Amino acid sequence: MHKLAALLFGSTLFVHCALAQSQRFIIDDDEFLDKIVATGTSLLKHGKLQSVDSLRAQVRTKGVPLKLAPTSQQKFSPPDLCDRLRESTLAVGSLYKCPDCGEWHFNSSAGFVVAQGSVVCTCCHVILAQDENVQESYLLAADATGHVYPVQSVLAADTVSDTCFVKIDAPHLKPLPLRVGIRAGERVYCLSHPGGYHFMFTEGLVSRVNRRRDDALDSDGQTNGFLTRPILFLNVTAEFAPGSSGAPIVDESANVVAQVSSITDAGEPTPGDENNSPSPSVPVRFCTAAEEILRLTDPNLEKAAALETRAKSKGPHPGGKSKNGR
């Protein structure tokens, strides 16, 4: 794969040949997690990890200028696309000390390299989610080989779109380009870690492009009577589940068109309406569009975001009960 990096800007034929000769990738989830925990605890003993609490304090709306990879025109077959995504997709999550057994565990979500220089894109809630019973946790990223990279800092974030950039030390990892403007009906692919089943590859279609607003929160995390600005989302039929937050949704050229955010079970009864039986549930998968990720490269994002709330409407929000894809 190191040779492949030098060929990506050369002949399309050579790229396909190099990928075709790749060995089949086989993941052992137990070995993968054991390696992360062993490496993570060793790094902790040497003072190389940042606590989740310290990183959580850095998650505020801010942008950072980045040099992004150019949009790709290279077409990949699905197996080759999976290989390409695995070079840039990470397991991102917390190494935590279990309050029940006292052992260390790794709780994985996802992220992907978005810019050369070790910049990883993931969801804000991957960092912000808290378990009151866990007293000690540290944020890590791991590639498909199980190599562990401590998350050093939060470079940029937009809590409204639930998207952030974090810094690791892995300059050799290849970034995925962003692509805006995808339409409903286009085919997309996802590489994620649903339920701890790492590096699962799925495909589907963009079923809808939509905008959604949510209740705006004040500095104490309470609703303040306003709605957020409208956030651009894609609904996709490519399957993912909790454990997939932050995973890339890409086109056939490995351009990131969105990032996994949350899942809604359409068809559930209205909360508090226990008299009606739930209708058959259909998972509706929400992914934050690449346009929202691109906003994080605006160094003036904090000022712009302050002007984008509007008076809260009186109508109910459409949709069912949402849960994070984490």
Residue ranges and their predicted role:
Residues 6-16:
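Bacterial N-terminal signal peptides
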Residues 22-61, 198, 256-326:
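C-terminal cap/linker of serine protease catalytic domains
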Residues 73-79, 89, 95-123, 149-150, ...:
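A conserved glycine-rich beta-strand in the N-terminal activation segment of trypsin-fold
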Residues 80-81, 130-131, 152-155, 167-201:
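Active-site substrate-binding loop(s) of clan PA
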Residues 87-104, 164-175, 199-300:
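Active-site region of chymotrypsin-like
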Residues 108, 115-159, 184, 271-273:
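Catalytic-histidine neighborhood of serine endopeptidases
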Residues 123-125, 193, 262:
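Short, surface-exposed secondary-structure boundary micro-motifs
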Residues 134-138, 143-153, 184-188, 199-220:
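Beta-strand/loop subdomains of soluble extracytoplasmic proteins
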